Amino acid sequence: MSLAPGPRNLITDVPGLRVGNAQDLVIKSGVTVMLADAPFTAGVHIMGGAPGTRETDLLAPDKTVEAVDALVLSGGSAFGLDAASGVADALRVMGRGFAVGDIRVPIVPGAILFDLLNGGSKDWAENPYKNLGKQALEKAQQDFSIGSE
């Protein structure tokens, strides 16, 4: 049996998956969001000396939550973890999330990378990553840019 790439040769060749990117040229950083038409199963393997993650513990098979609403990958080191908050806020407005009574709690695990010394301006008054997360979610589609633009 040989495997052949899908029509796009992208992760979005999997039916129902979409990816969105957002970047800020001033801070030289960005966010990528992956979501599906419905909550999906995800897993994680965390490595490195100083990993930065959000809600990744709930991806273990013994946890209550069995699916996630989106995954977020962000620059910005610890500041970038806030990108998942922007995604969660937008998903909640869309009615997505884990049902807790009448409330919907979007499950949005995320991970960051350290890019604070990349030459971009980090002298912001307000953390830009929450908005970048929301922008990336809004841009999610089957065809998306790969890498830095």
Functional labels for PLM-detected ranges:
Residues 1-149:
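Alpha/propeptide regions of enzymes that mature by internal proteolysis
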